[in-house]
Amino acid sequence: MANPELLEEQREETRLIIEELLEDGSDPDALYTIEHHLSADDFETLEKAAVEAFKLGYEVTEPEELEVEEGDTVICCDILSECALNAELIDAQVEQLMNLAEKYDVEYDGWGTYFEDPNGEEGDDDDYVDEDDDGVRH
């Protein structure tokens, strides 16, 4: 099970991200692509976690090498979902993916999304919000 203190930090971060997006004028009713970030020291370790996330219903990006402090390299990927900008839904995904990261000994590096212009194109069928979505992928 994920560390309760780290989960609480993520919950606080989630609310801060949502608050800042809404203060900046992002569309509160849009469907957002949520990018959860995972990293590991080697491809094989990350691949196991990515495959599990895919089986849970998430979309997974191609792994990339990323140079970090002091020239070290990690392998990273994003675990993607689409949902409303709802803290409880995102909290459920964060907890699920933090547990997965712990299981496979990879790092959960938080999540991000993009500003959604409320004056953007209308009529996009992808903006359907599923009222029954509890955030957890099965």
UniProtKB/Swiss-Prot annotation:
InterPro entries reported for this sequence: RraB (IPR016716), RraB-like_sf (IPR036701), RraB_dom (IPR009671)
Pfam family, one: RraB
Annotated GO MF terms: endoribonuclease inhibitor activity; enzyme binding
Location(s) in or outside the cell: Cytoplasm
One GO cellular component term noted in the UniProt record for this chain: cytoplasm
Superkingdom classification of source: Bacteria
Record's keyword terms, sorted: Cytoplasm
Disordered: region residues: 111-138
Positions with biased composition (Acidic residues): 118-138
Subunit structure: Interacts with the C-terminal region of Rne.
UniProt function note: Globally modulates RNA abundance by binding to RNase E (Rne) and regulating its endonucleolytic activity. Can modulate Rne action in a substrate-dependent manner by altering the composition of the degradosome.
Family note: Belongs to the RraB family.
Name this protein carries in UniProt: Regulator of ribonuclease activity B
